[in-house]
UniProtKB/Swiss-Prot annotation:
Its main location: nucleus. Keywords: Auxin signaling pathway, DNA-binding, Nucleus, Transcription, Transcription regulation. GO terms for molecular function: DNA-binding transcription factor activity; transcription cis-regulatory region binding. It holds the Pfam family ARF_AD. The lineage of its organism: Eukaryota, Viridiplantae, Streptophyta, Embryophyta, Tracheophyta. One of its GO terms (cellular component) is nucleus. Residues 1-19 have a biased composition (Acidic residues). CDD domains: B3_DNA. Residues 177-279 bind DNA. This is Auxin response factor 4. Homodimers and heterodimers.
Length: 788
C-alpha cells in the first residue's frame, strides 16, 4: 500500500466538492494512507475539530518537507488549481526507462505535443519497497487554452492567476541534517556516527552530567513506521552515536555505503526519518503501477481524457526522471515568448553527487524537433546543447527551453553554417563574455573557427596586402608549430631559437606593408621603435589586446571542437620578417620590435641570438624561456627598475613564489601503534574513505585489517589544534581540509586511554619530548592526554 503525503490535506477536504473536484469526468478518489500517519491521526483529522486540524496541518507540513528532501532540491511540483502544460513525450521518456517496446510501435493517437491542463490534485507518495518518492498528479485537459501562442490578453490574465495559485516553495525547517553513510555506519556491528552540531540541533538535549549520557529516539519514516534508536554520547574521543536499533534499520532498508540518511525535527519535537540512495533508480514507481502504465496505455488514457474532457492521472518519479514533463503554464509561455537562438549561452541547474545543486554553463548548438515525424513542432528537448564541462555531457545533450537560464552576462557565439561575407571581424568584441584573457572582457572563440580553419583572414587580403591569404595561413601555422614545440620542450628552445626563427623568417615571404591587423594606438608598444604601416583605418579592432592573455587555455580546456584562445591570438596577429630592417630606421643598430609571449616580454640581443632584432616578442600565448633563468631574472630586474611615472617609481607586481613554499603540506603523516617509523600519504590522490583504508593497509601491510572493525583496529586523526577525532565522521572534503596527522591504534589502546597506566599515546608524547631535547629531528605535536 502506498501513502499519500499531500501537503494541502485541509484544503483538499474543503474543496473536494468544488467544480474542479475529483468528481468531474468520473475520476477516482484515492484515500489510502493519507499523509502516512497513524489511523488515530487520520480519524482525528476527519473529526473537524480545530486542534486536530492544526495537528494534521503540522504533520502534513513536516511530511511534505521530508518528501521534498528525499526527492532532491531541484524538484518543484505544481499546486492544486494551477494551469500546467503536459508533455506526452516526457511521460513516455520516463516509461521507456523500464519499457522495452520500440517508440515507433506505439500509436500516437493524434495527440498534441503540448496539452494544457489544470491540476486537480497532487499526492506525494513513497514506494514501500524501495523508499523512493514519487507523485501522482491528477490533470484535467483545458480545451480553451490549447491554441494559445504566448501572446495576448489571455496570457496576462492567466499570469495573474498563476501568481495567486502558483506553486509555493516548501517551508524549510532549520532542524534537519543529511549525512552520507560511511563503511563504519553500515557495519552490522557498528553504529551511526552523528556529527556533533547535527545531534545537538535535531535530537533532544542530553544530560551531560551522567557518566554516559544517553536517550531513546523514536523517528517515523515516510510510511509512518516508527524506528527506535539509542542515542549515546561515548567513546574516545567522545562522539554521538546511534547504537541499538540502527543495525536493524540498515538491514531492513538495505542501506549501503554512499546512501544518505535524513533526520528532521518539527516544531513539536517529533523526529522524521528518510533515505536517499546513492544509485538513482531506473524507475522509482512501484511494480504494480509500471505494469498498468505501459507506453501504449499512457497515450490511450490521455487521448480518451482529452476527447471526453475527463481527468487522467500522471505518475512522476523525480529521482528517476531527468526532466519534469508537467510544466507550469506561465513558465512554458515565458520560454517560448523569447525564442532561444543558436549560439545562446546559458546556465542550467544540476543535482550532482558531490553537491546538492550546481549550475553548469553551455551553448546552444542547434534547434530542432526531437521526433519530427511523430511529434512535430514539439518544444520537448528541442535544443541541442554543448556543455563547457565534460562531465555534464554524460547527462544529456538535449534540453528544453524552460530548463535553461539564458544569462545576459554570457553573450552569444557566432555559429553559422554558411560562409561569412568578406569583411574583418567587426563583431568580435561584442560576442565575448566577461573574463576573456585576450580582450579583457572575456569570452569564447568564434565558433565558426572550428569548422573553417583555413578562412582566418577572409577578406583582409584585399586591404593593403601584397600576398594572398594563404600566405598568412602558412605564416600562422609556422608560428603555431614553433610555439607548440617550444612549449613542449622549453629546454631546447634557447639552442634552436636561432635556426627556427631563421627558417621562419626566410619561409614566410610576407611584405611588411601588409601586416595591417591591429591599431597601433590601441595596441601600444607592440612595434617598439618603428611602425610598419598605419592601421588607423581599422576601428573595429579598437580595444583588442591579445597581449593581455595570462592563461589562454582556461576557457576551452579539453574541447576538441573549439580552437583554443591561443590559436585565435596566433591566427589573428601577423609579424612579417621578410625585411627586418626598415629603410626608414635612423638608429645605428638593428630596429627593435616586441612579440608578446603572453606572460612576459623577453629581450633578445642581436649578437647573442644570431642577428635577431632586439625586443623581439610574438603574440604567442605560451611561456617560453629563451634566455635561461639567470638572464630572465636580470631582464625582469632591469624592466622593473625602469617603470616610472612623473619621476616616481611604480609598484611592480612581484612574481609568484616558488612551488616549494606553497606546497609545504602535500602529504599527511600516518603513525601506527608499535611502529617507530611513520608513513606519509597524499590525500589529494584519493577519492574517499574507501581509498584511504586501502592505501593505509598497503602502506603498513595490513590487508583486510582496517576495513573490518572486528579485526580490532581503530583509525583516529588529529587536526591543527591537536584535537583527536575518529576518521569517517566528517565528509571527505572536510576531513582532507582539517586533518593534520592520522593514527592507527588497537581497540584496547583506545578504550584504555583514560586508565592510570601509561598508554602508547603518552609514550609517543615522551618519545617526542626526548627527541626534541636531543635535537635529533623536528617532533610533531602529540595529542593531549586527559585523565578522567
Amino acid at each position: 500500500m502506498e501513502f499519500d503525503l499531500n501537503t494541502e490535506i485541509a484544503e483538499v477536504e474543503e474543496e473536494e466538492n468544488d467544480d474542479v473536484g475529483v468528481g468531474v469526468g468520473g475520476g477516482t478518489r484515492i484515500d489510502k494512507g493519507r499523509l502516512g500517519i497513524s489511523p488515530s491521526s487520520s480519524s482525528s483529522c476527519s473529526s473537524g475539530s480545530s486542534s486536530s486540524s492544526s495537528s494534521t496541518g503540522s504533520a502534513s507540513s513536516i511530511y511534505s518537507e521530508l518528501w521534498h528532501a528525499c526527492a532532491g532540491p531541484l524538484t518543484c511540483l505544481p499546486k492544486k488549481g494551477n494551469v500546467v502544460v503536459y508533455f506526452p513525450q516526457g511521460h513516455l521518456e520516463q516509461d521507456a526507462m523500464v519499457s522495452y517496446s520500440s517508440p515507433l510501435e506505439i500509436p500516437k493517437f493524434d495527440l498534441n505535443p503540448q496539452i494544457v491542463c489544470r491540476v486537480v490534485n497532487v499526492q506525494l507518495l513513497a514506494n514501500k519497497d524501495t523508499d523512493e518518492v514519487y507523485t501522482q498528479v491528477t490533470l484535467l485537459p483545458l480545451q480553451e487554452f490549447s491554441m494559445l501562442n504566448g501572446e495576448g490578453k489571455e496570457v496576462k490574465e492567466l499570469g495573474g492567476e498563476e501568481e495567486r495559485n502558483g506553486s509555493s516553495s516548501v517551508k524549510r525547517t532549520p532542524h534537519m541534517f543529511c549525512k552520507t553513510l560511511t563503511a563504519s555506519d553500515t557495519s552490522t556491528h557498528g553504529g551511526f556516527s552523528v556529527p556533533r552540531r547535527a545531534a545537538e540541533d535535531c535530537f533532544a538535549p542530553l544530560d551531560y552530567k551522567q557518566q554516559r549520557p544517553s536517550q531513546e529516539l523514536i523517528a517515523k519514516d515516510l510510511h509512518g513506521v516508527e524506528w527506535k534508536f539509542r542515542h549515546i554520547y561515548r567513546g574516545q574521543p567522545r562522539r554521538h552515536l546511534l547504537t541499538t536499533g540502527w543495525s536493524i534499520f540498515v538491514s531492513q532498508k538495505n542501506l549501503v555505503s554512499g546512501d544518505a540518511v535524513l533526520f528532521l525535527r518539527d516544531e513539536g519535537g517529533e523526529l522524521r526519518l528518510g533515505i536517499r540512495r546513492a544509485a538513482r533508480p531506473r524507475n522509482g514507481l512501484p511494480d504494480s503501477i509500471i505494469e498498468k502504465n505501459s507506453c501504449s496505455n499512457i497515450l490511450s488514457l490521455v487521448a480518451n481524457a482529452v476527447s471526453t474532457k475527463s481527468m487522467f492521472h500522471v505518475f512522476y518519479s523525480p529521482r528517476a526522471t531527468h526532466a519534469e514533463f508537467v510544466i507550469p503554464y506561465e513558465k512554458y509561455i515565458t520560454s517560448i515568448r523569447s525564442p532561444v537562438c543558436i549560439g545562446t549561452r546559458f546556465r542550467m541547474r544540476f543535482e550532482m553527487d558531490d553537491s546538492p545543486e550546481r549550475r553548469c554553463a553551455g551553448v546552444v548548438t542547434g534547434v530542432c524537433d526531437l521526433d519530427p515525424y511523430r511529434w512535430p513542432n514539439s518544444k520537448w528537448r528541442c535544443l541541442l546543447v554543448r556543455w563547457d564541462e565534460s562531465f555534464v555531457s554524460d547527462h544529456q545533450e538535449r534540453v528544453s527551453p524552460w530548463e535553461i537560464d539564458p544569462s545576459v552576462s554570457l553573450p552569444h557565439l557566432s555559429i553559422q553554417s554558411s560562409p561569412r561575407p568578406k569583411r574583418p571581424w567587426a563583431g568580435l568584441l561584442d560576442t565575448t563574455p566577461p573574463g576573456n584573457p585576450i580582450t579583457k572582457r572575456g569570452g569564447f572563440l568564434d565558433f565558426e573557427e572550428s569548422v573553417r580553419p583555413s578562412k582566418v583572414l577572409q577578406g583582409q587580403e584585399n586591404i593593403g596586402s601584397a600576398s594572398p591569404s594563404q600566405g598568412f595561413d602558412v605564416m600562422n601555422r609556422r608560428i603555431l608549430d614553433f610555439a607548440m614545440q617550444s612549449h613542449a620542450n622549453p629546454v631546447l628552445v634557447s639552442s634552436r631559437v636561432k635556426d627556427r626563427f631563421g627558417e621562419f623568417v626566410d619561409a614566410t615571404g610576407v611584405n611588411p606593408a601588409c601586416s595591417g591587423v591591429m591599431d597601433l594606438d590601441r595596441f601600444p608598444r607592440v612595434l617598439q621603435g618603428q611602425e610598419i604601416c598605419s592601421l588607423k583605418s581599422f576601428p573595429q579592432f579598437a580595444g583588442f589586446s591579445p597581449a593581455a592573455a595570462p592563461n589562454p587555455f582556461a576557457y576551452q580546456a579539453n574541447k576538441s571542437s573549439y580552437y583554443p584562445l591561443a590559436l585565435h591570438g596566433i591566427r589573428s596577429t601577423h609579424v612579417p620578417y621578410q625585411n627586418p630592417y626598415n629603410a626608414g630606421n635612423q638608429s645605428s643598430g638593428p630596429p627593435s620590435r616586441a612579440i608578446n609571449f603572453g606572460e612576459e616580454t623577453r629581450k633578445f640581443d642581436a649578437q647573442n641570438e644570431g642577428g635577431l632584432p632586439n625586443n623581439v616578442t610574438a603574440d604567442l600565448p605560451f611561456k617560453i624561456d629563451m634566455m635561461g633563468k639567470q638572464k630572465g631574472s636580470e631582464l625582469n630586474m632591469n624592466a622593473s627598475s625602469g617603470c616610472k611615472l612623473f619621476g616616481f617609481s611604480l609598484p611592480v607586481e612581484t612574481p609568484a613564489s616558488k612551488p616549494q613554499s606553497s606546497s609545504k603540506r602535500i602529504c599527511t603523516k600516518v603513525h601506527k601503534q608499535g611502529s617507530q617509523v611513520g608513513r606519509a600519504i597524499d590525500l589529494s590522490r584519493l577519492n574517499g574513505y574507501d581509498d584511504l583504508l586501502m592505501e593505509l593497509e598497503r602502506l603498513f601491510n595490513m590487508e583486510g585489517l582496517l576495513r573490518d572493525p572486528e579485526k580490532g583496529w581503530r583509525i583516529l586523526y588529529t587536526d591543527s589544534e591537536n584535537d583527536m577525532m575518529v576518521v569517517g565522521d566528517d565528509p571527505w572534503h572536510d576531513f582532507c581540509n582539517v586533518v593534520w596527522k592520522i593514527h592507527l591504534y588497537t581497540k584496547e589502546e583506545v578504550e584504555n586511554a583514560n586508565d592510570d597506566n601509561k598508554s602508547c599515546l603518552e609514550q609517543a608524547a615522551l618519545m617526542m619530548e626526548a627527541s626534541k631535547s636531543s635535537s635529533v629531528s623536528q617532533p610533531d605535536s602529540s595529542p593531549t592526554i586527559t585523565r578522567v
